[in-house]
From Swiss-Prot:
Region (Disordered) residue spans: 206-238
Domain of life: Bacteria
Subunit field text: Interacts, and probably forms a ternary complex, with MukF and MukB. The complex formation is stimulated by calcium or magnesium.
Localization (cell): Cytoplasm, Nucleoid
Descriptive protein name: Chromosome partition protein MukE
Keywords per UniProt: Cell cycle, Cell division, Chromosome partition, Cytoplasm, DNA condensation
Length: 238
């Protein structure tokens, strides 16, 4: 084993970091110690994960994550459509002036209100009903789904809980939902278009305890409708 790789693996931070990466966690600069470890040993750990048919990716924004291949020994899974939509709205908010005005802190309710403003209401209602319109009860069900999505995205490292329950700060890792807009002159406007058009953006695996599926390339999820679940192949930002 190369000396520098042995040094990385021997680091007391590595076991927990390895577990986080395998669960789908994104390691951004806010996670100071783990991020510094990945920066120092990026090449060596990249070679290490190749043995598991996975790629250690450093995104243009500086955060790290694992990208399993179809033959990977590391489990892969999918995100539900509502998770994808919430992620795209988070990315939009990250790019917005409101983030600076709020010192980077948002509430669950603010995220939900922004979702209702930005997204197509008919598509939103279809996430909880088979109808294009919904009652107040349906909106409450949608809010519950949004809260569940935020908990999932928190485990993936997309948001960081702040103080009391219901407040969070958005991590740069949300750019996993904005890969298609990185090269656009107006990234905020391009992200808004993605939200309104309902276009999918590829995202890495969700934590295994949350609806985890081991997928072969192009495999279908026969027990989940196409409207409820994106059959994502988790191939990264490209």
């Amino acid at each position: 084993m190369p000396e520098k790789l042995a040094k990385a693996i021997a680091n007391p931070l590595f076991p927990a970091l390895d577990s986080l990466l395998r669960s789908g966690r994104h390691i951004a600069s806010e996670d100071l110690d783990n991020h510094a470890l990945l920066c120092e040993f990026e090449h060596e750990l990249g070679m290490f994960y190749q043995r598991y048919h996975a790629e250690l990716v450093k995104a243009p924004e500086g955060f790290f994550y694992l990208r399993p291949r179809s033959t990977s020994l590391i489990a892969r899974s999918v995100l539900a459509e509502v998770d994808m939509l919430v992620g795209k709205v988070l990315c939009f908010l990250y790019l917005s002036p409101e983030r600076l005005a709020h010192e980077g802190i948002f509430t669950n309710q603010e995220l939900f209100d922004e979702l209702l403003v930005l997204a197509d209401e008919q598509k939103l209602m279809k996430l909880v009903t088979n109808r294009a319109s919904g009652s107040d009860l349906d909106k409450e069900k949608l809010f519950d789904k949004v809260r569940t999505s935020l908990r999932r995205l928190k485990r993936l490292g997309m948001i960081i809980q702040v103080g009391e329950q219901g407040k969070f700060r958005i991590s740069e890792a949300v750019f996993r939902f904005g890969a298609d807009v990185r090269s656009n002159d107006d990234m905020k406007e391009a992200q808004l278009r993605l939200i309104r058009d309902g276009e999918a953006v590829v995202v890495h695996n969700e934590e295994s305890s949350q609806s985890s599926f081991d997928l072969d390339e192009n495999e279908k999820l026969s027990d989940i409708s196409a409207e409820e679940q994106h059959e994502l192949e988790l191939e990264g930002d490209a």
